[in-house]
């Protein structure tokens, strides 16, 4: 009882279990057929007895149907065409449980139904599922699917793969069946990743030759969208070599003239990718993020890493996000399990879910829409444990242990296989490992496939043109590995020795950044570029500061 002259005593009771109990009660009503007031019928004839209020609360489609002046408002049975009963059952169960199972088999049908019936949360979950499973062999179809159903994230990320890996994409069977409009859309992208004439002429010829009778008249239109110089001799030869494209000399000459008419063309360089330098070490840990466009040779600075005292972390890129995993702090060598994620589009950092195993000097790569953390050091000894982060499930998942735990090794992905090369093994890195370990995610198995010609640690590896390149280390030796032939070959040596450098592929070339040449005892600031066509290295610029042990990744512009 309140004292005289004071406000009434108020106690606000809030039952935290009420929302769950409330939903459970309606679930029971649904299962028992109690208080139902609407029936949904599939084309197969299967019916579901539901509650209008529950459907309207989850679906804008049903909310509009039951509140607007529509004939269905007064009906007790609603017939829904074009929706399989399994899909409708899943959506109805979601309305009563807040859960729905999404699989590779049902995801597209489920998204279509969720889009139609405006179950917006389910549609978004399906969209994220499809983004998680994007690859070169489905990105064209997914891009069209995303455009039709207005899925902005799926559209953007499928376009990112389509443009950044165009050479691999056009060699897929799916490419031959695309429409002229879709092909023109691809060619018109300013960020289409092409760096050779044949890289863009070949798919045009291949697509035309696939259905030459119906597509031959499209050829001139396609060529007019190519924003690079086209060699008339090369074009004539390419057309002539396609036996299904048999033209008269006049027809070839006409095609060449129209395609190369400057009134129809805009010759320009394509800005396809941007290099991100994350942190690093220069006598102390660095926390800066530096962003470089190789076309303009301009550096800009991004938001700094929030945890600025750590070093020897793993860095990898997944879509627009850059993941920084593990490492250790300067004042001790205790391995960390912390994860920071940098969004390159918003220039913002967020803290991610900690890894299952703390580690430093480990390898980090992306494969199949997931982020992998492999090996590294923990308590002075190389770790065999490996794990991956599934951004859809928002959890780290352990995988099979590596055959040999290694620290300060290098890893990259080629044809959906992870390769881990070299590194230190033994307590506190007492010896160097000479084997190449490969991981097949389909069977969750590691294998030893070959030996490195010169075992080292502190190297970088990158995939290019179906081959794996080893750069950096204590020498200037650069080597190329062909997995199909299981052969190594030495290529042109680098200009500098670069221990713990960074390396990335951009526009068909290898860029190697910074590093530490033990012979000189200084940190490097320069950037070397390797052109595989010329088999030649050259200095093409400088980092904002000298550094080693930094993250170096490429984000493709969309």
From Swiss-Prot:
Keywords: Kelch repeat, Repeat. The keyword Repeat applies. InterPro entries: BACK (IPR011705), BTB-kelch_protein (IPR017096), BTB/POZ_dom (IPR000210), BTB_POZ_KLHL23 (IPR030566), Kelch-typ_b-propeller (IPR015915), Kelch_1 (IPR006652), KLHL23_BACK (IPR047068), SKP1/BTB/POZ_sf (IPR011333). Residues 36-104 form the BTB domain. Residues 139-240 form the BACK domain. Kelch repeats lie at residues 274-320, 321-369, 370-416, 418-466, 467-508, 510-557. The keyword Repeat applies. This is Kelch-like protein 23.
């Amino acid at each position: 009882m309140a004292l005289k002259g004071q406000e009434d005593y108020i106690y606000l009771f809030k039952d935290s279990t009420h929302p769950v109990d409330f939903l459970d009660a309606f679930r029971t009503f649904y299962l028992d057929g109690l208080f139902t007031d609407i029936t949904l019928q599939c084309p197969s004839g299967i019916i579901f007895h539901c509650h209008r209020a529950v459907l309207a609360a989850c679906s804008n489609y049903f909310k509009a149907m039951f509140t607007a002046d529509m004939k269905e408002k007064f009906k007790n049975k609603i017939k829904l065409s074009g929706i399989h009963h399994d899909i409708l059952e899943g959506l109805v169960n979601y309305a009563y449980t807040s859960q729905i199972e999404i699989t590779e088999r049902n995801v597209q049908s489920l998204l279509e139904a969720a889009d139609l019936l405006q179950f917006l949360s389910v549609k978004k979950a399906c969209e994220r599922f499809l983004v998680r499973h994007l690859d070169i062999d489905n990105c064209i179809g997914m891009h069209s699917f995303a455009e039709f159903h207005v899925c902005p994230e799926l559209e953007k990320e499928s376009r990112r793969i389509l443009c950044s890996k165009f050479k691999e994409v056009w060699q897929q069977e799916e490419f031959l069946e695309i429409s002229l409009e879709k092909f023109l859309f691809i060619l018109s992208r300013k960020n289409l990743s092409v760096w050779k004439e044949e890289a863009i002429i070949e798919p045009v010829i291949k697509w035309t030759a696939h259905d030459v009778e119906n597509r031959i008249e499209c050829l001139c239109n396609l060529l007019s969208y190519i924003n690079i110089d086209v060699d008339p001799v090369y074009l004539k030869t390419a057309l002539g070599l396609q036996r299904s494209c048999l033209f008269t000399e006049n027809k070839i000459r006409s095609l060449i003239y129209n395609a190369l008419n400057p009134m129809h063309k805009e010759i320009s360089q394509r800005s396809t990718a941007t290099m991100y330098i994350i942190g690093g070490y220069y006598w102390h840990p660095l926390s800066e993020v530096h962003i470089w466009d190789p076309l303009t040779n301009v550096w800009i600075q991004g938001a700094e890493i929030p945890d600025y005292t750590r070093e020897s972390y793993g860095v990898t890129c997944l879509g627009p996000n850059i993941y920084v995993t593990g490492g250790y702090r300067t004042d001790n060598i205790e391995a960390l399990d912390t994860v920071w994620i940098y969004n390159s589009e918003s220039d913002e950092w967020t803290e991610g879910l900690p890894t299952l195993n703390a580690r430093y000097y480990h390898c980090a790569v992306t494969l199949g829409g997931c982020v992998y953390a492999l090996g590294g050091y923990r308590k002075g000894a190389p770790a065999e444990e490996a794990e991956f982060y599934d951004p859809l499930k928002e959890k780290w998942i352990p995988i099979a242990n590596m055959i040999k735990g290694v620290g300060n090794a290098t890893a990259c992905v080629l044809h959906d296989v992870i390769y881990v090369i070299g590194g230190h093994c033994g307590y506190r890195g007492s010896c160097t490992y000479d084997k190449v370990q490969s991981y097949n995610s389909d069977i969750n198995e590691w294998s030893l496939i070959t030996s490195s010609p010169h075992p080292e640690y502190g190297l970088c590896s990158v995939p290019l043109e179906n081959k794996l390149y080893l750069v950096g280390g204590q020498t200037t030796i650069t080597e190329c590995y062909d997995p199909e032939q299981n052969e190594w070959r030495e290529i042109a040596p680098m200009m500098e020795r670069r221990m713990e450098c960074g390396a990335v592929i951009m526009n068909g070339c290898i860029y190697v950044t910074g590093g530490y040449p033990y012979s000189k005892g200084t940190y490097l600031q320069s950037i070397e570029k390797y052109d595989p066509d010329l088999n030649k290295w050259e200095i093409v610029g400088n980092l904002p500061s000298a550094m080693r042990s930094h993250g170096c990744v490429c984000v493709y512009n969309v």
